[in-house]
């Protein structure tokens, strides 16, 4: 019983985070293929990445209600925080044969931010603490990495943002490092430092900063 398990964790002073994977959802695409990302070459076929996993189209608003409902139900059983992962467009697969039937009138960042706002507003009455997982390179890239994620467009809608700065996910040559895996501390320090700088710039004005 999940509620009982969470109560046990709370009794031991453990802060419990519930992780919800969002747009990568092979189960839901089987039930509602009309909401899924499709193949450009045959728009009746659900697109899959190199691992055989399918995605819901970010712009599929009927799915947004499902995610909000899932968040409400999860929070009601006692989670201290709701963490949303795979809040992005797909990235690994045949990107030349991909079609987003629900997201054709807006850019990827715009579509994703619309979802963020809908999620935030839908869960606001619960008082739930919300967090978002982002690609690590959102800390340094100003573009959307072709997945819709832009750090500044995430900040207004979540209490915490967690860039996944795994050194293994950065390309060779990043920041001058031939192999980022050989510079674990330096990479994390550099990328998270950039994230802090951008967060301060996006959420505060110089006049509002005080130093003690």
Task: Tell me the role of every PLM-derived stretch.
Residues 22-24, 86-90, 134-138, 167:
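Active-site-proximal loop/turn and secondary-structure-junction residues that shape catalytic pockets
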Residues 9, 16, 67, 74, ...:
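Conserved, mostly hydrophobic/aromatic
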Residues 79-80, 158:
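A structural motif
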Residues 2-7, 23-76:
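Active-site-adjacent "subsite" loops/lids of carbohydrate-active enzymes
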Residues 102-134, 138-212:
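Glycoside hydrolase catalytic-domain groove-lining segments
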Residues 26, 32-34, 81-109:
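Active-site-proximal loop/short-helix segments
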Residues 1-6, 12, 16:
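Membrane-embedded segments
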